[in-house]
Each structure stands twice: as C-alpha cells, then as structure tokens.
Amino acid sequence: MKFKKVVLGMCLIASVLVFPVTIKANACCDEYLQTPAAPHDIDSKLPHKLSWSADNPTNTDVNTHYWLFKQAEKILAKDVNHMRANLMNELKKFDKQIAQGIYDADHKNPYYDTSTFLSHFYNPDRDNTYLPGFANAKITGAKYFNQSVTDYREGKFDTAFYKLGLAIHYYTDISQPMHANNFTAISYPPGYHCAYENYVDTIKHNYQATEDMVAKRFCSDDVKDWLYENAKRAKADYPKIVNAKTKKSYLVGNSEWKKDTVEPTGARLRDSQQTLAGFLEFWSKKTNE
C-alpha cells in the first residue's frame, strides 16, 4: 500500500507496511492514532515538503541532523586540547562520509526499516519504539556507534566515519521530544509531527552554537546509557510541545502552536548541540582505548 507523504514513523513519499494490530491510545505514555484516518484525510493534513530528516547530505537548510553536527563542531572548536584537535581534524577530513551516513539513515534500508522508521524512535521509560518488540533508536544507534569504533581501530576509516554518521542520526533523532515519546507522523493529530519538524527547519538558524556553550557529557562508559539519557532529556520537554492546546491549534489550522513551542524548541536545539558535542568526544575516547 502506498500513502503519499506519510509513513508510520516519518514524513516521506514511500511504501508503508500495514501491521494487522490494534493499539489503544494511552495519554500517560506512548500516543498513537486514536481513530485510523483515511489516507486522503492524512494527506490533507501534511505539509508538502519533507520534514526534519536528512533531505540532502550537506545542505543544513533541509538537514537538521547535519546542522546539529556542524553546531557541535563549533562547540568542540573552543578550548582545543591535543585530543580535541585530532578529533576536529578527522571530523573535517571525513565530513563527506559522516554526512552520507546521516543522510542514508533516512533513505536506505536497513536503516529506515522499509519506510516505517521503527528504529528512529525510543521511549526511555518503556525502553521501546512505537511498536514494541522491534529494534529502537537506543539499540540501533549503539550498534552503529560500536561498529564505528571497531572499524576505526582496524584502520577502516571510511566505513568508521560513515557509521559514525549513522549513529549521529539516531542519537539526534531521540533528542527530538516526539521521537523520545513514540509520537509518529500518524499519531493524533496526524501530520502534527511533520508540521512541527518543518517548523523547526524555519527557526533553527536562530539557535546556532554560541561561545558560552560547552560539550555536555553523561557519566557512563556505555553508549546505550548515552542514548538513554539523551532521550530522557528530550522526553521531559514533550509536554511543552505536544499537549491539548498545541493539538487543538494545529487541528483548527492556526499558528498558535508555533508560538507555544518556539521557546522549548530553541532550548531543545541548544541542548542537542551540546550533548552531541559530548557524544563525539566520547566516540573519540572509545576509539583511542
């Protein structure tokens, strides 16, 4: 079956898998589409451009993941010590491979799960994606992070940095509150996920890395803990972005939801840059062990 502009996870033009299951909405945790909407009803609510994804490998205007990576680089460029200088040089040298990994995560199998994007979501409280039993962003991001470290140690630098790009994609996915609470493109109200991410693309330039920003680190030597903590921080902001007021505003077609979400979104973008900077330093540390 084909739906235009929407799949279960993200907002792309692609085939979707239709799962023969019934899922009840639960307002206290994961939110799902309460009453299945007809394809034309969903389509009418969706914007006619791709959402917060990786729509071009190196165009930050339409690639929020890569934009966050470039902001993280700016943060790392301050207070450069020997290890950080080496990391910065390598990130610059292998920028193309990193960018391609970030991009492919949204456009190639097995990374985008045949257009369902199941592995791009992760609820840290339930330790699952939006369909329990499938690989989530914590598991998938950790897998490519660890493969990247192994490839680097073996001198396979092109694949190491490509897989680092994949890991960056999953890590930054769950720094978005909707992804950290399994609120998908067809969660109620259908299309709000996509509209919100498109809105982020229009305002993110207001929240670039500044001199006072530092790399934020989590106190763990396990990358799964890093992904968990990153999602936990994002989920804490979920009620500020998805609530009764913002849903109603979106459904009636006014822009009040944008005004209500701009402040928490800006704070979320800044935090995402800083935790990603820490994530990159953590990766560098692991490659040198």
UniProtKB/Swiss-Prot annotation:
<feature type="domain" description="Zn-dependent PLC">
    <location>
        <begin position="52"/>
        <end position="289"/>
    </location>
</feature>
<dbReference type="GO" id="GO:0008270">
    <property type="term" value="F:zinc ion binding"/>
</dbReference>
<feature type="signal peptide">
    <location>
        <begin position="1"/>
        <end position="25"/>
    </location>
</feature>
<feature type="binding site">
    <location>
        <position position="120"/>
    </location>
    <ligand>
        <name>Zn(2+) 3</name>
    </ligand>
</feature>
<keyword id="KW-0964">Secreted</keyword>
<dbReference type="GO" id="GO:0004767">
    <property type="term" value="F:sphingomyelin phosphodiesterase activity"/>
</dbReference>
<dbReference type="InterPro" id="IPR029002">
    <property type="entry name" value="PLPC/GPLD1"/>
</dbReference>
<keyword id="KW-0378">Hydrolase</keyword>
<comment type="subunit">
    <text>Forms monomers, dimers and higher order oligomers, but only the monomer is enzymatically active.</text>
</comment>
<dbReference type="Pfam" id="PF00882">
    <property type="entry name" value="Zn_dep_PLPC"/>
</dbReference>
<feature type="binding site">
    <location>
        <position position="173"/>
    </location>
    <ligand>
        <name>Zn(2+) 1</name>
    </ligand>
</feature>
<dbReference type="GO" id="GO:0034480">
    <property type="term" value="F:phosphatidylcholine phospholipase C activity"/>
</dbReference>
<keyword id="KW-0843">Virulence</keyword>
<keyword id="KW-0865">Zymogen</keyword>
<dbReference type="GO" id="GO:0005576">
    <property type="term" value="C:extracellular region"/>
</dbReference>
<protein>
    <recommendedName>
        <fullName>Phospholipase C</fullName>
        <ecNumber>3.1.4.3</ecNumber>
    </recommendedName>
</protein>
<feature type="propeptide">
    <location>
        <begin position="26"/>
        <end position="51"/>
    </location>
</feature>
<keyword id="KW-0862">Zinc</keyword>
<dbReference type="InterPro" id="IPR008947">
    <property type="entry name" value="PLipase_C/P1_nuclease_dom_sf"/>
</dbReference>
<feature type="binding site">
    <location>
        <position position="106"/>
    </location>
    <ligand>
        <name>Zn(2+) 3</name>
    </ligand>
</feature>
<feature type="binding site">
    <location>
        <position position="173"/>
    </location>
    <ligand>
        <name>Zn(2+) 3</name>
    </ligand>
</feature>
<keyword id="KW-0732">Signal</keyword>
<feature type="binding site">
    <location>
        <position position="179"/>
    </location>
    <ligand>
        <name>Zn(2+) 2</name>
    </ligand>
</feature>
<feature type="binding site">
    <location>
        <position position="52"/>
    </location>
    <ligand>
        <name>Zn(2+) 1</name>
    </ligand>
</feature>
<feature type="binding site">
    <location>
        <position position="169"/>
    </location>
    <ligand>
        <name>Zn(2+) 3</name>
    </ligand>
</feature>
<feature type="binding site">
    <location>
        <position position="65"/>
    </location>
    <ligand>
        <name>Zn(2+) 1</name>
    </ligand>
</feature>
<feature type="binding site">
    <location>
        <position position="197"/>
    </location>
    <ligand>
        <name>Zn(2+) 2</name>
    </ligand>
</feature>
<feature type="binding site">
    <location>
        <position position="193"/>
    </location>
    <ligand>
        <name>Zn(2+) 2</name>
    </ligand>
</feature>
<comment type="function">
    <text>Major virulence factor whose phospholipase activity facilitates pore formation by the pore-forming toxin listeriolysin O (LLO), leading to vacuolar membrane disruption and vacuolar escape of L.monocytogenes, which enables the bacterium to spread in the host. Acts as a phospholipase C exhibiting broad substrate specificity, with the highest activities towards diacylglycerophospholipids with phosphocholine, phosphoserine, and phosphoethanolamine head groups, but less towards phosphoglycerol or phosphoinositol head groups. Is also able to hydrolyze sphingomyelin and plasmenylethanolamine.</text>
</comment>
<comment type="similarity">
    <text>Belongs to the bacterial zinc-metallophospholipase C family.</text>
</comment>
<dbReference type="InterPro" id="IPR001531">
    <property type="entry name" value="Zn_PLipaseC"/>
</dbReference>
<keyword id="KW-0479">Metal-binding</keyword>
